[in-house]
Amino acid sequence: MSPEDFDRLQSLMTSRAGFRLTRDRMKLAEHRLGPVARREGFETVDAMLEALWAKPVASLGWAVIETLLNPETWFRRDRVSFDTFGKELLPALSRARGGQPIKVWSAGCSTGQEAWSLAIAAQEAGIAVEIVATDLSQRALEKARSGAYTGFEIQRGLKAETMLRWFDQAEDAWIARAELRAMVHFARANLCDAPTDSHRFDIIFCRHVLSDVEPARR
């Protein structure tokens, strides 16, 4: 990948997604784009980028962007945040709202572990919540909606008793149970877009997201 192509990738990421792509990630970007190029029918990353610059195609552009986003996440990441959510915030809000469901937004939910962790915390607190979990990546959302995780993914952050209580094993996957699924709605959203009147929540989780966003758009 040439420095010029990387500069254009930086502009693409910033203009469409608001994310910054720093120069030290150039080799990583080229490595990640290899499978995308092959999937899209190109022999090389350079050939794919040349085609993209010549005729910008929305689907190809988003495929490139999604591949360069950081999907890193796991269950109950930063455990203290979820303990505070379940043991302090939810009870206080529930009392203030007279038992009405608490509306929660998981912004930048990636592959869903944060949203399911919030649902588990609410279930264990015995408090009704409605969780909207959004992300820019369609591929990440597909996995999130499936609620299916590998043994490694499910054990990364969850104790065995929690895993067995809230997930069913199906061959090599662990799948979120119906009680959790009823609480979470996944949708695609760009955090850089202006919010609508429907975006009204009692609690917003937006964690490990803004560090990758252009400072001017945070």
Language model segments and positions:
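Residues at alpha-helix caps and immediate loop-helix transition turns in enzyme cores, especially N-
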Residues: 25, 81, 114-117, 197, ...
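Short, well-ordered alpha-helices that flank and scaffold nucleotide-derived cofactor binding pockets
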Residues: 87, 91, 120-124, 146
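Short strand->helix junction
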Residues: 19, 74-75, 111, 194, ...
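Conserved SAM-binding loop of SAM-dependent methyltransferases across substrates and taxa
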Residues: 111-127
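Conserved hydrophobic residues forming the short capping helix/wall of the S-adenosyl-L-methionine
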Residues: 37, 93-94, 122, 148-149, ...
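Extended basic-aromatic, gly/pro-enriched interface segments that bind polyanionic ligands
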Residues: 107, 129-205, 209-217
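Conserved AdoMet
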Residues: 1-105
